[in-house]
Amino acid sequence: LSLMDHGGIYRTLLSVHMKRPWEDVVAFAKAAPRRIIPTVRIKGRGYHRGPRNKYFDRLEGQLGSDPFGAMAEVHVWHDSDGGKYHEIRIDFDDELFLAAFDAAKGKDWPLIVHMEFAALSFIGKRDYMDKLETFLRSNQDHPVVMIHMAQLEEPDVRRLLAAHYNLHFMTSHASPFYQSGGKPFINMINDGKFKPQWKKLILEYPDRFVFALDNVFSKFWMPDLYLDKMKMWWNVASDLPNDVAQAFAHGNAERLWKLTAKPDGVMKAPHEAMKALGPVTGYSANAAHR
């Protein structure tokens, strides 16, 4: 919470990773119910490795816990990046995907879909794009959010937004911070602002973009990196008209996930918060965890 305060973040949709039990995120949310939204974990044992019943058991257990208010990303295509990660390649009619989608529909939660289009061949991209659009047309009454901008550049995103009014995009990993790794994430930002084509598109579709970070690994929660990202994103958002910036930063997420609106004036920009609050406190501030 101290890290969020310093970064100007009022609320976080939080899930668990690796061997951490999902009950932990429920406990975090109970301790700070206005700030932490516990988010159902999809990936993990049974989804991309091991017996499938492990996934179904985990999903059922989480869905039976009242505090959950969102569902984390559902992987359809996840590249291994040369063997560094588990590759996931399933279709929209796979029982794993459909179980998550049915659960999201039952809870009236947006479905976050993980697709890495830039890591596919030309034919692979074409085939998965056809499958995605078929799914979107078949479920026009349910909001779908593509995490990491689906690794798509502006022309593809523009076409998809025009064709599918239930489609939204999350800006996680779509920044200069992710251009030196092995995965081909797009970069929406140049010189501390949205690139012109992206700013134009956001202004045309102000209700379809959701600010997000995807803090998968512990290093992403370390104060220096986290706050550098948040300083950048606050500056980027400040180049938008205020109503569009507010929608991008939190309003669209509040609408899609049916969250209470962020109270006015409760958060400061990172450069102001860091002066007012002093050092970050809590677990992530301990250098031993870096």
What are these regions (language model features)?
Residues 1-16, 203-208, 216-290:
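Mid-to-C-terminal alpha-helical segments outside catalytic/metal-binding sites
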Residues 30, 34, 46, 87-211:
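Catalytic pocket-lining loop regions of alpha/beta-barrel enzymes
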Residues 1-99, 103:
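Mid-domain alpha/beta scaffold segments of enzyme catalytic cores
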Residues 21-23, 78-82, 119-122, 153-155, ...:
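Short catalytic/ligand-binding loop motif for oxyanion handling, primarily in non-cytosolic enzymes
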Residues 1, 22, 52-56, 93-97, ...:
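Well-ordered, non-membrane alpha-helical segments in soluble/globular domains
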Residues 72, 78, 166-178, 225-233, ...:
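Active-site gating loops and adjacent loop-to-helix segments of metal-dependent hydrolytic enzymes
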Residues 17-19, 43, 75-77, 116-118, ...:
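Catalytic metal-binding/acid-base residues of hydrolase active sites
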Residues 10-16, 37-41, 69-73, 110-113, ...:
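Structural recognition of the beta-strand scaffold that forms the well-ordered cores
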